[in-house]
């Protein structure tokens, strides 16, 4: 039952393409393997489909690269191959787990542009998992922020970056170094992230929140809807956050 969901409905890109690709299989064979497992295509039709995906993800000389092994590719090319494998069965949704972490900045931008392009041309939904708020601002339509294993806020990207509701979201944005002078101290969130194996009685961020009240630690806090947004906070804020700007 899970095989019908994996790759066909939901597929995944891992953050480290070098360890995700099979080192003893050619690029073409790895894409064809997915096509054989999850589509009715066989033989030359399957290989033609694999070649088509290499073209879609922007691999140069795709016919030659079909016969290449992973060690012959650059980091950016390996990630493009991973994207081709993930999309070869034409899933409805793609989960991208830190897809640019192992890449340099210029290649990161290329991969993000590719994902945005494929989202539009292939009509797929993308769930991007990342710690990089700059990446979120660049590609996301909606943002879900997690803290200590819980979703604490969900909003459109525009609302999240201009008027975040949860104290953790607000503090996180204020801690961004962009636009600050070298002589300026960076704002930091006090305390440490709690251990996830402990028992929680209230808000998981309460111990680090400057605006926490006694009731924040007494009862489990649930996600509440505010318009088309959701926030896990008893006392959400709605005034704009003044973010650092570079001159």
Model feature map: region roles:
Residues 88-92:
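A short, proline-enriched helix->beta-strand linker immediately N-terminal to the Walker B motif
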Residues 156-247:
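Charged, flexible cofactor/metal-binding loops and thiol motifs
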Residues 68-73, 77:
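Conserved ABC ATPase signature
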Residues 45-64, 173-174:
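Conserved ABC ATPase "signature" region
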Residues 18, 24-37, 47, 51, ...:
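Short helical segment in ABC ATPase nucleotide-binding domains corresponding to the A-loop/adjacent helical element
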Residues 31, 83, 107, 111:
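Hydrophobic anchor residue at the start of the ABC signature
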């Amino acid at each position: 039952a899970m095989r019908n969901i994996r790759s066909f409905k939901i597929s995944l890109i891992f953050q480290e393409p070098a360890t995700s690709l099979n080192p003893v299989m050619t690029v073409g064979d790895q894409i064809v393997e997915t096509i054989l497992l999850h589509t009715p295509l066989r033989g030359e039709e399957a290989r033609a489909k694999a070649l088509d995906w290499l073209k879609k993800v922007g691999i140069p000389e795709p016919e030659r690269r079909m016969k290449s092994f992973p060690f012959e590719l650059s980091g950016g090319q390996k990630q493009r191959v991973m994207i081709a494998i993930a999309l070869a069965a034409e899933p409805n949704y793609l989960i991208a787990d830190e897809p640019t972490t192992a890449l340099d900045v210029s290649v990161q931008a290329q991969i993000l542009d590719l994902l945005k392009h494929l989202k539009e041309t292939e009509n797929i939904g993308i769930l991007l998992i990342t710690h990089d708020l700059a990446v979120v601002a660049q590609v996301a339509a909606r943002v879900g922020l997690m803290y200590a294993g819980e979703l604490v806020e969900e909003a459109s990207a525009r609302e999240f970056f201009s008027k975040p509701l949860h104290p953790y979201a607000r503090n996180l944005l204020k801690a961004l170094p962009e636009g600050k002078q070298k002589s300026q101290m960076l704002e930091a969130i006090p305390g440490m992230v709690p251990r996830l194996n402990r028992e929680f009685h209230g808000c998981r961020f309460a111990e680090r929140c400057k605006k926490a009240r006694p009731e924040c630690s007494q009862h489990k806090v649930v996600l509440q809807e505010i318009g088309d947004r959701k926030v896990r906070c008893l006392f959400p804020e709605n005034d704009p956050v003044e973010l650092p700007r570079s001159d």
